[in-house]
Amino acid sequence: MYRHLSEGIEDHREQEQKVENAANIQDDNQLTVEQAIANLQGEDLGLRVYAAWWLGRFRVDAPEAIDVLIQALEDEDDRTNVGGYPLRRNAARALGKLGEKRAVPALIKALECSDFYVREAAAQSLEMLGDSSSIPRLIELLNDQVPGTLPAPEPPQLTQPFDAIIEALGTLGASDAIPIIQEFLEHTVPRIQYAAARAMYQLTSESTAGYNQYGDRLVQALAQDDLQLRRAVLSDLGAIGYLPAAEAIADTLAENSLKLISLKGLLEKQFQPTKPEDLSPGAIKVMQLMDALL
């Protein structure tokens, strides 16, 4: 157990050191799009990892940037001592931010990577890109039916990034995945339980009996002790726009900035392309709660 934890920390520190070294060479104000694209194709691994992060951070959606990021998903040069692929991770994360659907096939392929965190980043980016063609492979990954994948290098050594996969399936409307997602409502890891509740709310029809139970379960989770989990639940409630959670969100022991983001998600769900005077009472209440947090 402790060996896996040490490996995970070592893997993370090795990646951070590469990015830090690159940042010391070229800061954000000096780096241009052309230079970042060139760096991503160069030989300096630190500069390559940093360039992939930079292109995503600044939403550089030039065709050339998309091309080199897709190519980076198959990189074999940048590997940590414990087998991770830092460049692939950053490339996968960046592609989700750039909104280019032609990255979808490469990201689906990345779900087969042995590196747990590449698979996690690929699932998150496929969710952001919103392409349903990724659903079958995501379901296979959720069922742990993709060969050659390795578990997370630190406790609890999850075999797959279940929360990222489940959230992607919920956002993509993968109703075929409901039976398997339901099983994760009782997972031993709380954040995976919450991801399952979020997805079940998204995938269940409003006319179904007990529809609100999944949103209510997330509201109840706002009262638990772990700040990191409360932050995750705030994100989940904002993502599904669960209006009954508004006051609980505002009262949660967490940063106001995160509560405002969550409430913004609720508000966006309520907004209709109508005149301001046609706003629902629920939307008005959310706006009042947001004002109080500012």
Swiss-Prot record:
Keywords noted in UniProt: Antenna complex, Lyase, Phycobilisome
GO cellular component: phycobilisome
Short name of one Pfam family: HEAT_PBS
Name of the top EC class for this enzyme: lyase
Family annotation (Gene3D superfamilies): Leucine-rich Repeat Variant
EC number(s) given by UniProt: 4.-.-.-
Gene Ontology molecular-function annotations: lyase activity; oxidoreductase activity
Domain of life, per lineage: Bacteria
Family per record: Belongs to the CpcE/RpcE/PecE family.
Purpose of the protein: Required for the chromophorylation of the CpcA gene product.
Quaternary data: CpcE and CpcF associate to form a lyase.
Name by which UniProt lists this protein: Phycocyanobilin lyase subunit alpha
Species in which this protein is naturally found: Microchaete diplosiphon (Fremyella diplosiphon)
Gene that encodes it: cpcE
